[in-house]
Amino acid sequence: MSVNAATQVVVVSGLGGEPQYEERFSKWSEQVAKASASVTGDPAQVRRLSGDQARRENIEAALRAAAQGAHAGDRFVLVLLGHGSFDGTDYRFNIPGEDITGAGLKALLDRFPEGVTQLVVDATSASGAMAESLAGPHRIVIAATKSGERNASRFGGYWAEALNSSEADKDKDGSVSVQEAYDYATRKVAESFKSDAAIATEHSRLAGDDAGRFVVARLGAAALFANDAQLAAMRGQQEGIEQRINQLRAQKATLAEDDYYGKLEPVLVEMARLGQRIDARLAQLGVANGGRSDSRF
């Protein structure tokens, strides 16, 4: 993703029907929204709709605004938490007032400019009914359940947990990708049914490309790179230096050895000095960096 690319997130928690579900869905949406800000770098780019705010007109307005503000290379995330239903023809996300349909959501998502990569996490019951209709290029779709699975889904809670868990970060790079969060949530759902000695009533699915490269949360020091202006600027400089190093390496075969290393050395020194500045900034923020001078997240 380009250094200047933006990420927008909309998180919606629908009707619970019962107080325990209302509280549960609201809590999950709060956790997802908070973790998502570690990627956007700006909490204002995360829109959370919960309770009476989660009405169809507000969801539509949030998606239209996100589409208008998006450009090719950007990313957009939509997370739906709550109950869904499927009557054999239409999927519906249960919200205050008139429900929003799968067809309605697809029409709104299709308004985004070409080249915007989208992630849709539908963590509701019967969500599988919407998954196939949403499939398309530049779109990753996660459904918590199959279309005929109508029990309250557990997936959303474990998705929220994954975005805040170092356990989900399998490659230990300080970031949680879509694939890592999905694998974590899927595993935890299966373990929960096994622990309850119950038959699994939900089976999630993921469709789309580059799920391993789409970052949905940053952890620890990595989160600071999204939220601290100085670190974010230095990360941009770091990526620029890396590009120069890669360009020099690509020219190695065409350069005399002394000329190649003469050009490479000052760039490597520049990278090392920048790494020291990053480490110093992390120290100011009270974050240990494990002695790494490259500080790449």
Q: What feature does the model see in each segment?
A:
Residues 30-33, 118-201:
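Active-site-proximal C-terminal subdomain of hydrolase catalytic domains
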